[in-house]
């Protein structure tokens, strides 16, 4: 039996999770498979995975941060292209990170390699013209969100809505008090989760605001317990440095990972935009979304972004169900005020959790298996369905 080689590139923590679940499913379908490229720590725990570069090399945000790293990023991309062109994998899967992956996919496809792009770029939000480059670069797009497929259908680009792996992994009814017991958290405490980001630039920009907000909330809720999950030791160290500077006396429990558990056992959260907002929704944890960036980045992006919402719960619902506080509105007083509104309005609190449940069911589709089946169709040179 011929061994199967798959090139794969994930660029940040959310892509690492998606990649790990996909690899797990593909390893079940194919016993003779190997993955090479850029993999994160979760992907590397799965069988037959080899990473040529650290995932941290691609985990950056902000226009000027990217500009400063362009030479190194281009060098990595060229090296990956050269290696994969030599190895001729049966399939290449680019997971998210479109600015890195789409160009790589375009060049690999020209070399006769089959291409899947896993996670639709946010063409519905900005730079919709990218869809023409995507059409030239991929054999199939795997979309995580239900409204994305129609966009590709309109341009005759093969696309499958596979659902979201987080929706499959997280139970519809999280056992809040069992999780609290496992984390040694008092079941009678009021818990606030702080999630200032999974990238260093986010930690630097948002941690102070979130911590100051937590100090205000603590003054209003006497039995408040503040929980903070951190995805790696680098971010944890930086967050602790900021805490010592702005809130040395604020009692906080920091967890290594355990992001789902922290959200599921919390009563509410302050969370940055991105996958964490989806995870909060799936954990049935009412939230306030806070996000800011450097002023010049915000000024430039404001000119080109064409959406009404930045958080995934609001985008999936097609309406505002969680408050979003962006840039100047993302300040401690406003964030704290929104959390206290959630805390005091029990009727709205319950309604929000019911909406979260309905949205959870909508995107719970056994997604990793669906994605693996789509990949297998290309591996086996079957007709794309």
From Swiss-Prot:
Catalyzed reactions per annotation: 2-N,3-O-bis[(3R)-3-hydroxytetradecanoyl]-alpha-D-glucosaminyl 1-phosphate + UDP-2-N,3-O-bis[(3R)-3-hydroxytetradecanoyl]-alpha-D-glucosamine = lipid A disaccharide (E. coli) + UDP + H(+); a lipid X + a UDP-2-N,3-O-bis[(3R)-3-hydroxyacyl]-alpha-D-glucosamine = a lipid A disaccharide + UDP + H(+)
EC number: 2.4.1.182
Gene Ontology biological-process entries: lipid A biosynthetic process
Record PANTHER family: LIPID-A-DISACCHARIDE SYNTHASE, LIPID-A-DISACCHARIDE SYNTHASE, MITOCHONDRIAL-RELATED
Protein known as: Lipid-A-disaccharide synthase
Keywords of this entry: Glycosyltransferase, Lipid A biosynthesis, Lipid biosynthesis, Lipid metabolism, Transferase
Family statement: Belongs to the LpxB family.
Domain of life: Bacteria
A Pfam entry, by short name: LpxB
UniProt organism field: Wigglesworthia glossinidia brevipalpis
Pathway: Glycolipid biosynthesis; lipid IV(A) biosynthesis; lipid IV(A) from (3R)-3-hydroxytetradecanoyl-[acyl-carrier-protein] and UDP-N-acetyl-alpha-D-glucosamine: step 5/6
Alphabetical list of InterPro entries matching this protein: Glyco_trans_19
Purpose: Condensation of UDP-2,3-diacylglucosamine and 2,3-diacylglucosamine-1-phosphate to form lipid A disaccharide, a precursor of lipid A, a phosphorylated glycolipid that anchors the lipopolysaccharide to the outer membrane of the cell.
Molecular functions per Gene Ontology: lipid-A-disaccharide synthase activity; phospholipid binding
A cellular component annotation (GO) from this entry: membrane
